[in-house]
Amino acid sequence: MIQIKNAKELDGMRKANALSAAALKYGGEHIEAGMTTWELDKLIYDFIVKHGGIPNFKGLYGFPGTACISLNDTVIHGIPSHDIVIRPGDIVSIDTGAKIDGFNGDNACTYAVGKVDLEAQRLLDVTKAALYKGIEAAKAGNRIGDIGYAVQSYCEDAGFSVVREFVGHGTGKELHEDPEVPNYGHQGRGPRLVPGMTIAIEPMICQYDCKINQSKDGWTVKTKDGGLAAHFEHSNAILKAHTEIMTRFWDDPDFDTEKFSLK
């Protein structure tokens, strides 16, 4: 059942997503070649807790980390590890969120570590642009299928492929709520978007084929053909006159994580 948020609940969602976005940007700013994904996860954990939040990924369905940290051919759900070292030329996806006052934030970004090859950079650029194409379609009166169509058509026109098994979702007092928000679909189909809905739009895009494999750890999802994958995500509030990107801070070059405060 889709939960429609009132004004007070939307304010709670804004707060949780502001911290989530600040934590994500902080993590991205501190990625360094030579560090482990466990070390990166710890930095994000400390940032969230320092600002009064609860890392809402940690323990969810048994996931052990504060963030899903996924390198190169790992699409999503990479488990932070002492054994995974970030190298120059890697692409690193961070997917994380924070819970405050009973409300959940959720966002993701894929970062280049130093200089990456041209095709890897193009994958990042297209996937990020597709996120904003999806958000442009996510306006009151449209339908969920309009979002998926916008993402899918943009990525496939660029020669990339869209993961089918994992999708975006509603957010709120639960991290994952209805409706599902696929990154593929047909215009004019699916639930109608109405003011008060809060949804996470998150393109998961593959360099080559979209077929995936889940690792034996039960979490890590990789491309079957070993190609690269990228993942970007914003949590959004559907309002009457516009759609608000509640996690916009992670993509704001002027946002200073060192000065961030919820007070």
Predicted regions mapped to residue ranges:
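Active-site neighborhoods and metal-handling regions in enzymes and metal-associated proteins
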Residues: 1-263
